[in-house]
Amino acid sequence: MKYIVGARGSQLSVAQTNLVIAELKKAHPDTEYEIKTITTKGDTDSRPLFTIDQKGIFEKEIDRAVAQKEVDFAVHSLKDVPSELDDNLVLACIPKRETVNDVFISPDGSTLDSIKPGSVIGTSSLRRAVQVSRKRPDVTVKPIRGNIETRIKKASGENYDAIVLAKAGISRLGVDVKYTELSTDDFSPSPGQGAIAIVARADDSKTIEMLKKIEDPDSRLEIEAERALSDFVDSGCRFPVGAYAKSNGSEMTLTVTAFSVDGKQFLHVSKTGDKNNPKSLGQSAGEELREKGVNDLALNWREKVEEWNKT
């Protein structure tokens, strides 16, 4: 039996797809897998991500290939996958999640705390940008695009003194670079950060059963809580909300942070509940955020992004 696997052509996407295949081969040693790389809108549009008013820019073309039976299943970074898929597709598998932390990379070994005032920090994420500005208001934060290795090289160039990105990407690529891990207390991660999503056709029970061999139940439940929260407040690239769920026995704690554009205002919610009811936990955290005024922050962000788009 041979499966065709859809993925982006980026180094990270291919690397994490190969990691998935390696795990599948442990469970199904006689099965073959072939990667088919597919170009997405996110690969060809060089604008900062927060200015693109469209969800699924890194996965839509690949999932279309799944739906049209050009590939059997697709491997994505879960944070790039919209919570609502086409009716004929399903989030078939979430393998064990990597670390959710962000990291700070500077050529001279500086940390975020020690880097000199006036330094330029690059990031592709509004969420990271506002948290850098909140912790170090004396530095400049600029958008940065490109794959991970390109961004690391840019940190040594004329335009950037350091970058902030997800630790999971560095780990999966095996990049040899020194970094400082940032605490989730200071840098609340994106909902779904560090997780991989595998999408298949809803009616392809054989493929779904095969993929379930590498499913991690706790990772699935934690992701469901984070995405339920994200859906409730309608967060995304254009409105940064950090969310991190962690299981502990029969319980799960969901910690959420939302910021104003300038980082001076922030809302913080931490809720603990039954880990087997993650969507309820996410909605409960969302309701508390709403009571604390998250809708005002969201409007603040939408107005600012529209202003940026006009410049």
From Swiss-Prot:
The modification S-(dipyrrolylmethanemethyl)cysteine is found at residue 237. Binds 1 dipyrromethane group covalently. Its EC number is 2.5.1.61. GO terms for biological process: heme biosynthetic process; protoporphyrinogen IX biosynthetic process. InterPro entries: HemC, Porphobilin_deaminase_N, Porphobilinogen_deaminase_C, Porphobilinogen_deaminase_C_sf. It holds the Pfam family Porphobil_deamC. Pathway: Porphyrin-containing compound metabolism; protoporphyrin-IX biosynthesis; coproporphyrinogen-III from 5-aminolevulinate: step 2/4. SUPFAM superfamilies: Periplasmic binding protein-like II, Porphobilinogen deaminase (hydroxymethylbilane synthase), C-terminal domain. It is an enzyme of class 2 (transferase). Gene3D superfamilies: Periplasmic binding protein-like II, Porphobilinogen deaminase, C-terminal domain. Transmembrane segments: none annotated. GO terms for molecular function: hydroxymethylbilane synthase activity. GO terms for cellular component: cytoplasm. Keywords: Porphyrin biosynthesis, Transferase. Belongs to the HMBS family. The porphobilinogen subunits are added to the dipyrromethane group. HAMAP family: Porphobil_deam (MF_00260). NCBIfam families: hemC. Tetrapolymerization of the monopyrrole PBG into the hydroxymethylbilane pre-uroporphyrinogen in several discrete steps. This is Probable porphobilinogen deaminase. It comes from Nitrosopumilus maritimus (strain SCM1). The lineage of its organism: Archaea, Nitrososphaerota, Nitrososphaeria, Nitrosopumilales, Nitrosopumilaceae. The gene is hemC.
